[in-house]
Amino acid sequence: MSSGIGSLVKVIFKNFDVIAGPVISLVYPLYASVRAIESRSHGDDKQWLTYWALYSLIKLFELTFFRLLEWIPLYPYAKLALTSWLVLPGMNGAAYLYEHYVRSFLLSPHTVNVWYVPAKKDDDLGATAGKFTPVNDSGAPQEKIVSSVDTSAKYVGHSAFDDAYIY
């Protein structure tokens, strides 16, 4: 019987991130968020709103770089440690991370440095169009003749789904 319990403990320790990850990152925050909604104080609301914003950023990062992250052997444990720091009530990791990094990034004006500006070419649209303008025998550009539009034709809006549509 002891070998069965030993095997179970071994499996639990090997897969600790798989077992504890959803509990720490989803179950407890959902429970605490519902309690925060039902309470009258707004301090805990801010903690859990910032947690869910950071959780969505973490998930977006994971979905974007999942091929790279699967090659990092300690990533699940690092994510579990980070999530634990964000969630645990005494640490207020979500509020700290939001106030010091995310908020300052979102509120600061962003500038874009353009390191390469291509030189303007002589072949702009006007010059290119001039190359293909018809020329008469004297060498002068020929006036373009616009044909008159037949306005007597009536548009009958048929679609392929109408019974009167002719194939």
From Swiss-Prot:
Primary location: membrane
Induction: By abscisic acid (ABA) and salt stresses.
GO CC terms in record: membrane
Expressing tissues: Predominantly expressed in flower buds.
Superkingdom as given in the UniProt entry: Eukaryota
Keyword hit for Membrane: yes
GO biological process, one term: hyperosmotic salinity response
Pfam families given in the database record: TB2_DP1_HVA22 (PF03134)
Assigned keywords, A-Z: Membrane, Stress response, Transmembrane, Transmembrane helix
Protein topology in the membrane: Multi-pass membrane protein
Protein name: HVA22-like protein b
Organism ancestry: Eukaryota, Viridiplantae, Streptophyta, Embryophyta, Tracheophyta
Gene from which this protein is expressed: HVA22B
